Protein backbone atom coordinates (compact mmCIF):
# COMPACT_ATOMS: atom_id res chain seq x y z
CA UNK A 1 0.00 0.00 0.00
CA UNK A 2 2.92 2.34 0.74
CA UNK A 3 4.41 1.74 -2.72
CA UNK A 4 1.06 2.53 -4.32
CA UNK A 5 0.92 5.82 -2.41
CA UNK A 6 4.43 6.67 -3.61
CA UNK A 7 3.45 5.95 -7.21
CA UNK A 8 0.34 8.13 -6.93
CA UNK A 9 2.35 10.96 -5.35
CA UNK A 10 4.98 10.67 -8.09
CA UNK A 11 2.35 10.80 -10.84
CA UNK A 12 0.70 13.85 -9.28
CA UNK A 13 4.02 15.66 -9.06
CA UNK A 14 4.99 14.63 -12.59
CA UNK A 15 1.72 15.99 -13.97
CA UNK A 16 2.54 19.41 -12.48
CA UNK A 17 6.02 19.51 -14.04
CA UNK A 18 6.56 22.12 -16.75
CA UNK A 19 9.81 22.52 -18.68
CA UNK A 20 11.62 25.80 -18.11
CA UNK A 21 12.07 27.98 -21.16
CA UNK A 22 12.84 31.63 -21.67
CA UNK A 23 9.23 32.31 -22.63
CA UNK A 24 7.88 30.67 -19.47
CA UNK A 25 10.14 32.84 -17.35
CA UNK A 26 9.22 35.95 -19.35
CA UNK A 27 12.87 36.71 -20.09
CA UNK A 28 13.31 39.34 -22.78
CA UNK A 29 15.19 37.90 -25.74
CA UNK A 30 17.45 40.31 -27.60
CA UNK A 31 16.37 40.80 -31.20
CA UNK A 32 19.04 42.43 -33.34
CA UNK A 33 17.94 44.73 -36.14
CA UNK A 34 20.21 43.53 -38.92
CA UNK A 35 18.68 45.83 -41.51
CA UNK A 36 20.84 48.59 -40.05
CA UNK A 37 23.75 46.38 -39.06
CA UNK A 38 25.78 46.99 -42.19
CA UNK A 39 26.17 43.40 -43.37
CA UNK A 40 27.40 43.80 -46.96
CA UNK A 41 26.21 41.29 -49.52
CA UNK A 42 23.46 39.82 -47.37
CA UNK A 43 20.41 39.63 -49.63
CA UNK A 44 17.91 38.20 -47.15
CA UNK A 45 18.08 38.63 -43.38
CA UNK A 46 15.01 36.82 -41.97
CA UNK A 47 13.12 33.64 -42.86
CA UNK A 48 9.72 33.65 -41.11
CA UNK A 49 8.42 31.08 -43.60
CA UNK A 50 10.78 28.46 -42.10
CA UNK A 51 9.04 28.34 -38.70
CA UNK A 52 7.94 24.77 -38.01
CA UNK A 53 10.10 23.20 -40.71
CA UNK A 54 12.79 20.55 -40.11
CA UNK A 55 16.22 22.06 -39.36
CA UNK A 56 18.00 20.32 -42.26
CA UNK A 57 15.45 21.64 -44.75
CA UNK A 58 15.69 25.17 -43.28
CA UNK A 59 19.49 25.03 -43.45
CA UNK A 60 19.40 24.08 -47.14
CA UNK A 61 16.94 26.88 -47.98
CA UNK A 62 19.00 29.52 -46.15
CA UNK A 63 22.27 28.48 -47.79
CA UNK A 64 20.60 28.32 -51.21
CA UNK A 65 19.02 31.78 -50.91
CA UNK A 66 22.08 33.45 -49.43
CA UNK A 67 25.44 31.76 -50.20
CA UNK A 68 27.39 34.31 -48.12
CA UNK A 69 25.96 32.76 -44.95
CA UNK A 70 28.60 30.12 -44.34
CA UNK A 71 27.83 29.50 -40.66
CA UNK A 72 24.29 28.11 -40.20
CA UNK A 73 24.05 26.62 -36.71
CA UNK A 74 21.39 24.44 -35.10
CA UNK A 75 20.83 25.39 -31.44
CA UNK A 76 18.40 23.81 -28.98
CA UNK A 77 15.80 26.39 -27.95
CA UNK A 78 16.63 27.92 -24.58
CA UNK A 79 20.37 27.29 -24.85
CA UNK A 80 22.44 30.36 -23.92
CA UNK A 81 24.26 31.86 -26.91
CA UNK A 82 26.60 34.79 -27.42
CA UNK A 83 25.06 38.11 -28.42
CA UNK A 84 27.74 39.17 -30.89
CA UNK A 85 26.71 40.08 -34.43
CA UNK A 86 28.21 38.06 -37.27
CA UNK A 87 27.19 38.72 -40.84
CA UNK A 88 27.88 35.15 -41.96
CA UNK A 89 25.89 33.39 -39.22
CA UNK A 90 22.30 32.24 -38.84
CA UNK A 91 21.18 30.30 -35.78
CA UNK A 92 18.32 27.85 -36.14
CA UNK A 93 16.64 27.51 -32.75
CA UNK A 94 15.04 24.06 -32.71
CA UNK A 95 13.01 21.91 -30.33
CA UNK A 96 13.91 18.36 -29.32
CA UNK A 97 12.29 17.05 -32.52
CA UNK A 98 14.65 19.24 -34.60
CA UNK A 99 11.96 21.61 -35.89
CA UNK A 100 12.61 25.38 -36.13
CA UNK A 101 10.77 27.23 -33.33
CA UNK A 102 12.07 30.81 -33.77
CA UNK A 103 12.34 32.93 -36.90
CA UNK A 104 15.86 32.42 -38.30
CA UNK A 105 17.76 35.67 -38.87
CA UNK A 106 21.27 36.84 -39.66
CA UNK A 107 23.38 37.56 -36.62
UniProtKB/Swiss-Prot annotation:
UniProt induction comment: By tobacco mosaic virus infection, wounding, UV light, salicylic acid and ethylene.
Molecular-function annotations in GO: serine-type endopeptidase inhibitor activity
Propiece span(s): 23-39
Gene Ontology cellular component annotations, sorted alphabetically: extracellular region
One of the protein's GO biological processes: response to wounding
Family, per entry: Belongs to the protease inhibitor I13 (potato type I serine protease inhibitor) family.
Protein name: Proteinase inhibitor I-B
Protein's organism: Nicotiana tabacum (Common tobacco)
UniProt gene name: TIMPA
Amino acid sequence: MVKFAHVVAFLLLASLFQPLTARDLEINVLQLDVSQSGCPGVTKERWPELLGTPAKFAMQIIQKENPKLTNVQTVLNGTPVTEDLRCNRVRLFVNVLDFVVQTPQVG
